[in-house]
C-alpha cells in the first residue's frame, strides 16, 4: 500500500512550523531572518533538504515521508532543515561542515536534538528511481546510471566493460 502525501492543510502546518522556528531563532539571536521558499517536491529517502541554487535558498520537504511520520517530522525534520538555513545565513555554506559545531549550536538554540539522520521504515513511500541509459560494448549491453551517463556526455568520464575491456558506447 502506497503512503499518501500530506494534505494542503498539513503543508500549511509545516510552513507555519518552519516560520516559527526561524522567528524564534531570530528573537534569541537578535537578528532578522526571512522565510526562504518552502516546497514539498522532495522524493527519495530524505525527509527534508536545505539547498542553495544560483544564490537562492530553499527548504524542501518530502510529502510522502511527512505523510507517514507527520508528527515526528514536524518536531525533528523542520528544525533540522531550519538549522541548515540559519547556519548558512550566519556562517556561510563554505565555512562550516553540514552537521558541524555551528549547525549543532543552532539546533540547540531551536531546542532540538542535533541528530543527523532519522531511521524510518519507508515501506509504502514512493522512492526516487534513478534513470538508466543503454550502453554497449563488444560483448554485451549495459545499463548506466544517469550520473555516469552525464559524465560521459560532458566528456569528464569514460567507462569500460569489465569482461571485454572495450569502452562503453551510448546506444541511444
Predicted regions: what is each one?
Residues 76-88:
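Active-site recognition of the HExxH zinc-binding catalytic motif
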Amino acid at each position: 500500500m502506497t503512503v499518501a502525501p500530506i494534505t494542503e492543510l498539513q503543508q500549511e502546518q509545516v510552513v507555519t512550523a518552519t516560520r516559527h522556528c526561524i522567528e524564534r531563532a531570530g528573537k534569541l539571536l537578535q537578528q532578522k531572518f526571512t522565510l526562504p521558499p518552502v516546497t514539498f517536491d522532495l522524493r527519495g529517502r530524505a525527509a527534508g533538504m536545505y539547498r542553495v541554487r544560483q544564490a537562492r535558498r530553499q527548504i524542501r520537504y518530502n510529502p510522502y515521508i511527512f505523510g507517514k511520520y507527520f508528527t515526528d517530522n514536524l518536531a525533528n525534520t523542520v528544525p533540522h532543515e531550519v538549522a541548515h538555513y540559519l547556519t548558512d545565513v550566519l556562517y556561510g555554506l563554505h565555512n562550516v561542515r553540514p552537521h558541524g559545531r555551528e549547525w549543532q549550536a543552532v539546533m540547540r538554540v531551536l531546542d532540538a536534538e542535533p541528530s543527523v539522520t532519522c531511521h524510518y521504515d519507508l515501506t509504502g513511500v514512493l522512492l526516487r528511481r534513478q534513470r538508466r541509459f543503454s550502453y554497449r560494448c563488444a560483448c554485451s549491453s549495459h545499463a548506466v546510471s544517469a550520473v555516469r551517463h552525464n559524465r560521459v556526455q560532458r566528456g569528464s568520464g569514460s567507462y569500460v566493460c569489465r569482461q571485454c575491456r572495450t569502452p562503453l558506447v551510448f546506444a541511444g
